[in-house]
A protein has these predicted regions:
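Bacterial Sec-type N-terminal signal peptides, specifically the leucine/valine-rich hydrophobic h-region
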Residues: 16-19
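N-terminal secretory/targeting leader peptides
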Residues: 10, 22-119, 128, 136-329
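Bacterial N-terminal signal peptides that target proteins for export
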Residues: 1-9
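Thiol/selenol-based redox catalytic cores and closely related redox-interacting motifs
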Residues: 133
Length: 329
């Protein structure tokens, strides 16, 4: 009888321990939120879903990430602020709004900083880029990887731009940014801040003569219909950063941190491939529509670059060595 009671007690204890273990194991699962302001079929959003999928696979389902696309959780600035106090866990944002929180990122937005895309990726995928990712720590953020957003070019409705003097007097729509407004003014044009949604009608009615953006944006909002001159000056390449809240990051084990970083790099690789494909499709569509596409001769591009001296003095102050290092890559 005693043996039977002992056996029964042991069985109950074992069952209890097993159930407790199951509860603890179940409690370990983390459900996190990823904010993305672009549409579901956009390269950055597709990369976000890939990131979530990879993390879930490599953690055997312990970490599940829900992606909220289309700006459901707020605009980029609001999302960054929510990451800082842990209300949102992951995001991808342009370094333009991010530079409001980390001023050193302005360096990466300086006009005509890079010769081409290859140089930018040598910088961002190397030790310089790693330092910028790590610099987010003091803002309660952790930088994970770099996404592509292409090169921004000028376009207008008046004339093809082949030399610096062609910029003179053009009313160019810009984002409400001191750097962007200063850049346009330094090139001899008139900087006109305007809401993005008003640009098409502004071009159509002549309130503005031109604007600036990358191939997919020029195509997707049909600005090529009312501003048919597009110059490949590539004045800025503004990369985007994939981030995690430091409050969330500190909850991960070292092995999970390694997984998160690995998945971030893989998703960034996918985003860059998708972006390149999207650029190609947009360029083909714009060219087929009969737009005039021009490029700057090397000597002329040097004049555009030289005109940026005031911008470098203002926004690069204190970071001269970093800028020289970037340009030497």
């Amino acid at each position: 009888m005693k043996k039977t009671l002992v056996a029964a007690t042991c069985a109950l204890l074992a069952t209890g321990l097993a159930l407790t273990g199951c509860k603890e194991k179940k409690a370990e699962k983390m459900v996190l939120r990823y904010a993305e302001n672009q549409a579901q079929d956009y390269p950055t959003t597709k990369a976000a879903y890939k990131f979530a999928e990879l993390v879930e696979q490599k953690t055997n389902g312990r970490i599940h990430i829900d992606v909220y696309h289309g700006g459901q959780l707020g605009d980029e600035k609001a999302v960054i602020e929510q990451l800082q106090f842990g209300a949102i866990d992951f995001t991808r944002v342009s370094i333009s709004p991010l530079s409001e929180f980390e001023k050193s990122l302005n360096i990466l937005q300086l006009p005509y900083l890079y010769k081409d895309a290859a140089q930018m990726w040598r910088v961002l995928d190397g030790s310089i880029g790693e330092k910028f990712l790590n610099s987010m720590d003091k803002n309660n953020l952790v930088g994970l990887s770099w996404f592509d957003a292409g090169a921004r070019n000028f376009y207008d409705s008046k004339r093809p731009i082949t030399k610096l003097s062609d910029m003179k007097g053009l009313k160019i729509r810009v984002q409400e940014s001191q750097l962007m407004m200063g850049m346009v003014a330094a090139l001899g044009a008139s900087a006109t801040p305007m809401a993005y949604g008003e640009v098409y009608s502004g071009l159509q009615t002549g309130v503005i003569d031109g604007a600036e953006n990358n191939w997919p944006s020029y195509d997707s909002v049909s600005h090529y219909e009312v501003a048919k001159y597009y110059v490949l000056d590539e004045h800025t390449r503004v990369p985007e950063m994939q981030l995690v809240s430091k409050l969330t990051w500190d909850k991960f084990s070292d092995s999970d941190k390694a997984i998160i970083k690995e998945c971030a790099k893989e998703s960034a690789k996918l985003e860059r491939e998708l972006w390149a494909a999207k650029e190609k499709v947009s360029e083909e569509k714009v060219r087929a529509a009969g737009c005039t596409i021009t490029e700057l001769e090397p000597g002329e591009k040097e004049k555009f670059q030289a005109a940026m001296a005031p911008m470098y003095a203002q926004f690069g102050a204190g970071y001269e060595d970093v800028i020289k290092n970037i340009q030497a890559q």
